[in-house]
């Protein structure tokens, strides 16, 4: 399975490495130094398991099918799934989530790949994914919340207390895609 991941923070990088054990994963970021570090096998974030996985990948002890890139089109064009793990800043004074990074990532995916399933892992408000599916007339978007601790993100992905992937109850294709993603 070919999977692209938008964002290489705690959520994006941990899910990338988890999935790269059995899938071809390409992580996308907009920060050149992060992409370069990842491709050298160095973690740009503090997480013991992420550091260990990247190191073991470079030594061949634990080979991963993982690479990072700045080129969104290259990453997204042949992907079966694209995981969106971009930042969504919440302003408690305005009670507002800035979801523009999620929407921009989905736009970049759809510019080159209309068939990929988009899996939102970013923190978004309740009902956001359903509203996005309707407003964009795009039924290939599903949601999978993250339950990760900072600094323990990969460990938490490797040993999940639960796996949740949401899809509309009346959309059998989305349900099948969600079930498939949960098994990856």
Model-derived regions, located:
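NAD(P)+-binding Rossmann beta1-loop-alpha1 motif at the extreme N-terminus of oxidoreductases
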Residues: 1-44
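A structured beta-alpha segment of the ubiquitous adenosine-cofactor-binding alpha/beta core
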Residues: 49-79
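Redox-cofactor binding/interface segments in oxidoreductases and associated redox assembly factors
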Residues: 82-84, 120, 165
């Amino acid at each position: 399975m070919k999977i692209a991941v938008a964002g290489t923070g705690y959520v994006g990088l941990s899910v990338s490495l988890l999935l790269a054990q059995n899938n071809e994963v390409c992580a996308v970021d907009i920060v050149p130094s992060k992409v370069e570090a990842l491709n050298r096998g160095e973690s740009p974030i503090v997480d013991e398991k992420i550091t260990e996985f990247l190191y073991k990948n470079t030594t061949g002890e634990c080979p991963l099918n993982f690479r990072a890139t700045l080129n969104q089109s290259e990453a997204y064009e042949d992907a079966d799934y694209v995981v969106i793990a971009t930042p969504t800043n919440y302003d408690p004074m305005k009670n507002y989530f800035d979801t523009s990074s999620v929407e921009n990532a989905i736009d970049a995916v759809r510019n080159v790949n209309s068939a990929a399933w988009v899996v939102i892992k970013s923190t978004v408000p309740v009902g956001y994914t359903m509203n996005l599916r309707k407003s964009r007339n795009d039924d290939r978007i599903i949601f999978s919340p993250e339950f990760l601790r900072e600094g323990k993100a990969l460990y938490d992905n490797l040993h999940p207390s639960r796996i949740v992937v949401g899809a509309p109850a009346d959309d059998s294709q989305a349900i099948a895609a969600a079930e498939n993603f949960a098994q990856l």
